[in-house]
Amino acid sequence: MLRRGSQALRRFSTGRVYFKNKLKLALIGQSLFGQEVYSHLRKEGHRVVGVFTVPDKDGKADPLALAAEKDGTPVFKLPKWRVKGKTIKEVAEAYRSVGAELNVLPFCTQFIPMDIIDSPKHGSIIYHPSILPRHRGASAINWTLIMGDKKAGFSVFWADDGLDTGPILLQRSCDVEPNDTVDALYNRFLFPEGIKAMVEAVQLIADGKAPRIPQPEEGATYEGIQKKENAEISWDQSAEVLHNWIRGHDKVPGAWTEINGQMVTFYGSTLLNSSVPPGEPLEIKGAKKPGLVTKNGLVLFGNDGKALTVRNLQFEDGKMIPASQYFSTGETSVVELTAEEVKVAETIKVIWAGILSNVPIIEDSTDFFKSGASSMDVARLVEEIRQKCGGLQLQNEDVYMATKFEGFIQKVVRKLRGEDQEVELVVDYISKEVNEIMVKMPYQCFINGQFTDADDGKTYDTINPTDGSTICKVSYASLADVDKAVAAAKDAFENGEWGRMNARERGRLMYRLADLLEENQEELATIEALDSGAVYTLALKTHIGMSVQTFRYFAGWCDKIQGSTIPINQARPNRNLTFTKKEPLGVCAIIIPWNYPLMMLAWKSAACLAAGNTLVLKPAQVTPLTALKFAELSVKAGFPKGVINIIPGSGGIAGQRLSEHPDIRKLGFTGSTPIGKQIMKSCAVSNLKKVSLELGGKSPLIIFNDCELDKAVRMGMGAVFFNKGENCIAAGRLFVEESIHDEFVTRVVEEIKKMKIGDPLDRSTDHGPQNHKAHLEKLLQYCETGVKEGATLVYGGRQVQRPGFFMEPTVFTDVEDYMYLAKEESFGPIMVISKFQNGDIDGVLQRANSTEYGLASGVFTRDINKAMYVSEKLEAGTVFINTYNKTDVAAPFGGVKQSGFGKDLGEEALNEYLKTKTVTLEY
């Protein structure tokens, strides 16, 4: 026998604890709160001899009735207790038959006659959600907030014949937070603490220790019940009073006003303490000043000139939307569920079926409220999901915001993934039916998880190089947009879910993103063909295919980034331990070129994200569309807001601001050497941010006479003409040994003549248009310079006579070392050939290395000793032997000399986005 104080205690195998002082209870009331009080009282050993509750509604029993029936407790479902002021005889007999010693009323909407109230030995106790004697009446919580009280709480009191006037048994209080709503206050304090207090009150009565403290009349107030008809907003008041009125009716009954002839209810009010953001005016009946629909919600104004923001709006038909979307006509992005999330959805479907017992099958289109659910069922749904879905805490408004099952599951999944539930992704698309599919292209800046116009509304045309037509207008990011994107990325890193996420979960999101890229590869490749002129078949395999591989590769690295332990000299007689940690840098900027729009994004951003950073990425001004489509897919994959930000626009404005921004800790750039130098300078002067640069190239390809000539011709052409020559590692100069030079040139020209130049969406096309008009003109000038300097134009050198920016594949021979063609990169389909004397290995190496560039290089020979010697001597970040363009996601890629420094791809790329911290401790 164990003893606690003076009470005898016995423990049984069921785990329930029984004290000596226990009571027989009648529970009178309803709701989830009533159910929880019932369950906790039974758990503490009290015997509930009867539950008196309301009748089933639309075939659904109240949660309290369900719990009691499951336990075998007698349940009485009474439509009323009295008629014409007198207790119904049958009801009184049923009540007295259970022999209760105490009535417990946790939440009761019915009038209980006094003879029932006074019948038990210990009378009756009632839970009331205010600090009595203040706010007597049925809408106590509402009035606590409406009146701007700084303290809220509840009272458990002894019932008498007055209206909430009985003696106090116990009270509890809490501070009212500035933006508390009725729901927030109830969920945070009144519900959980109220359950505990009811159980404590019953035990105090059982122990004979329950006080009866008369309520003072000083400070007593009584307010009437708040219903929809008297919850209309009166606008001639201060912002704080308006705020209190709105939150004091949130969620029930809901403060409302008239907008465009329709009743609109406001939810989620907060006082605006900062400057009023820009927005679109919205006329509101009775308001002296129009509201403003902003990206953060609907801004309202009091008569004192101060403002508040409302987060959500509900219309007469029950539909609820984020207030920021009042004028929006965009489409809502759909989250695609993982296998684990599908299981959660099935669990929730069972919960819906239990609540909507009158609905035979829960379908995607099933509407929670149109199927008969009430506000009480909302509380039950939220609580059951919390219990059965790993503690997931929804808010009541989540149900109102997504009343149909399919939409509700979307909201739940977003919540599970740690996304902001306040605003869903809305995408305004430019849609085109092309390549036998409907291509849907976002065209706005993507900042903090939302597509948005540029701050100043500026746009520019993005051009289809196949015919020179305008694809669409794209937002032209301003300095303000860059600053917003950086701020969003910083907040996501320092305060958001991303910064708290474990590495394996980060990898899961990246795997999911890779899957989505693969699932949408036809659309992405089509956009790449439209926007950059990439041949569709090549775009599928390389532009998109390698992007998928890159994200999968780095997703696997997420949980394998680790430091090391290092033996150091011990501080004897103590000991020391030194270890290193690899940590993310923070906010990273990424600026990518136009030749592989999505692949260049993937090469840099995958490593950046795997390391745990957040990013702001500026795509090339002429090819922004796949980057913006990528942003949409990142939301579908579940990336939290602010982790990925895409800002289309110019290098001179957006790119320069990124290089100068003090909150950016790393910048990764692929582009020209002159721009790379400017970026490096700006990064150094601003805050010495870490930089990795992949810049220009003039990659030499040496072809010896002992090579496999057929392969050398085929690979040599690929080295130059792959992706229209718009390839950073393209062979900028071919050195062909004298004895095979003429045959090599002849074969190359023969093969060029077989190439089909045309529409990149045509599956038989080999060679598409150059990326943009200015680049085509630069290539034509390059050829003119070569001819003027005396190089021999063997083939091509002209624009193709058809619409668009097409250029003939071009071959120059007799290129001497002093010529412009020998020194400068064309970045186009121009083969520059120089011959070298038979056997002069060191001489050709000297010529190959006499450039400031060092990105890639190649050699073709059957002699392995010669191949290895040449690979050692070539000054380049990559050397290809008897192959070319063979890059892989696991192999580091990057240049030397003025081709830059730092690596993309492979494990080494992770180090570009990590910092090493050394920790030493003594013990």
From Swiss-Prot:
The modification Phosphoserine is found at residues 31, 650. Signal peptide: none annotated. It catalyses: (6R)-10-formyltetrahydrofolate + NADP(+) + H2O = (6S)-5,6,7,8-tetrahydrofolate + CO2 + NADPH + H(+). Mitochondrial 10-formyltetrahydrofolate dehydrogenase that catalyzes the NADP(+)-dependent conversion of 10-formyltetrahydrofolate to tetrahydrofolate and carbon dioxide. GO terms for biological process: 10-formyltetrahydrofolate catabolic process; biosynthetic process; fatty acid beta-oxidation; folic acid metabolic process; NADPH regeneration; one-carbon metabolic process. In the N-terminal section; belongs to the GART family. In the C-terminal section; belongs to the aldehyde dehydrogenase family. ALDH1L subfamily. It comes from Homo sapiens (Human). Residues 23-331 are annotated as: Hydrolase domain. GO terms for molecular function: aldehyde dehydrogenase (NAD+) activity; formyltetrahydrofolate dehydrogenase activity. Residues 1-19 form a transit peptide. The active site is at residues 128, 694, 728. This is Mitochondrial 10-formyltetrahydrofolate dehydrogenase. It is found in: Mitochondrion. Keywords: Acetylation, Mitochondrion, NADP, One-carbon metabolism, Oxidoreductase, Phosphopantetheine, Phosphoprotein, Transit peptide. Pfam families: Aldedh, Formyl_trans_C, Formyl_trans_N, PP-binding. The gene is ALDH1L2.
